[in-house]
Design a protein with these regions (language model features):
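Pocket-lining segment of extracytoplasmic ligand-binding domains
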Residues: 90-92, 101-102, 131, 167-257, ...
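N-terminal (or domain-start) structured segment
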Residues: 25-95, 104
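Acidic, polar ligand-binding/catalytic clefts
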Residues: 83-119, 195-198
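Extracytoplasmic
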Residues: 30, 42, 60, 70-73, ...
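Bilobed "Venus flytrap"/periplasmic-binding protein-like clamshell domains
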Residues: 32-58, 62-63, 121-184, 278-279, ...
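Segments of small-molecule ligand-sensing domains
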Residues: 247-324
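Structural recognition of the beta-strand scaffold that forms the well-ordered cores
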Residues: 64, 86-89, 124-126, 145-146, ...
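Short, low-complexity disordered leader/linker segments with a strong preference
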Residues: 1-30, 324
């Protein structure tokens, strides 16, 4: 009797192990995945937390979101193989690939491969109405928060101000901390390049009367001439409650990238999970409205991961996929 019971237990244990193995993704996949996201209070952070939950369910392996300073830190972590997935803006990715950004120290970062388009990053400026700031030009001599030093805004906004001949006092930091600072009147304005609605802008507007400072047509032209990677961008009216007309600005596109060493079938499964669950992605953040296959053509800089390229080919996406 004891022998029969022991055999039954062994069989049940074997079935359990096999079942767990089947539930843990493919045998040649990593045991876990980590996504490099951004600062708390930012779009990358919210998007990444939700994406990690989605992929954990769909891939049957634990996927974690890691808070970072943004694209520059994400690219460095990916190159060092400390994370396997990351969010980048294509402008910063271009600097990394070519080793041209000051932050690269001349080093080329080429471990990243494009997987899927995320959304446009419009640059947005906001001040409290009581500040008396009426335009971007008025930011001279004002205290302006621009997010983490390694984020897209932290890289680009100092250049914007130089090009536009505006001289504010710049403060970097996590978006949640900067939002507290402007709420306490320790800052005069915030400038951000992020998917709209930007979480901290929306939160501030719920408690304060705010003003969105639009770039003039001349300023848009000056920025695009100096920084050709910038495109024209529009934040639609109604994105924020007090934004009653379209907000014209410049922007960069965001992409999710993967380490080139990730298995092709895993990256294929990631693309499938994201595109097949668009409604859930939209619930994570409204900016995911642009996380659709057709927008893969927005990437003209990075090679696509072979697994992602196979997904676009199989799904008959229109366009040319840049691969290795």
């Amino acid at each position: 009797m004891t022998t029969i019971s022991s055999r039954i237990l062994i069989i049940l244990a074997a079935v359990f192990v096999l079942t767990k193995a089947a539930q843990s993704g493919e045998a040649h996949w990593p045991a876990t995945l980590t996504i490099g996201t951004g600062s708390p209070g930012g779009t990358y952070y919210d998007y990444g937390e939700g994406l990690a939950r989605l992929l954990t369910r769909k891939l049957n392996i634990p996927v974690f979101a890691r808070s970072t300073e943004g694209p520059t830190e994400n690219i460095k972590l990916l190159e060092a193989d400390e994370i396997q997935l990351a969010f980048v803006t294509l402008g910063v990715a271009q600097q990394a690939w070519n080793g041209t950004g000051e932050w690269t120290g001349g080093k080329q970062f080429r471990a990243m491969r494009a997987v899927f388009p995320m959304y446009d990053t419009p640059f947005q400026f906001m001040a409290l109405q009581e500040s008396g700031i009426l335009s971007v030009t008025d930011l001279t001599d004002k205290r302006v928060g621009i997010g983490p030093q390694g984020g897209t805004t932290g890289i680009y906004m100092p250049e914007f101000f130089k090009i536009l001949k505006i001289n504010p006092t710049i403060q970097t930091g996590n978006w949640s901390d900067l939002a507290v600072a402007i709420q306490a009147r320790a800052l005069d304005a915030l400038a951000v390049g992020a998917g709209a609605p930007f979480p901290e802008f929306a939160a501030l507007e719920r408690k304060n009367k705010v003003r969105y400072l639009a770039l003039t047509a001349g300023q848009v032209t000056a920025l695009r001439q100096a920084l050709p990677e910038l495109g024209s961008s529009v934040v639609p009216a109604g994105t924020y409650p007090s934004l009653t007309r379209p907000y014209q600005t410049v922007g960069l596109y965001n992409f999710a990238v993967a380490h080139r060493a990730l298995p092709d079938d895993l990256v294929y499964a990631i693309a499938e999970a994201v595109f097949a669950n668009h409604e859930e992605m939209m619930q994570i953040h409204y900016a995911a409205a642009d996380t659709v296959p057709a927008n893969f053509t927005r990437n003209t800089i990075l090679p696509f991961h072979d697994g992602a390229a196979r997904w676009y080919h199989n799904k008959s996406s229109s366009g040319v996929v840049l691969g290795d």
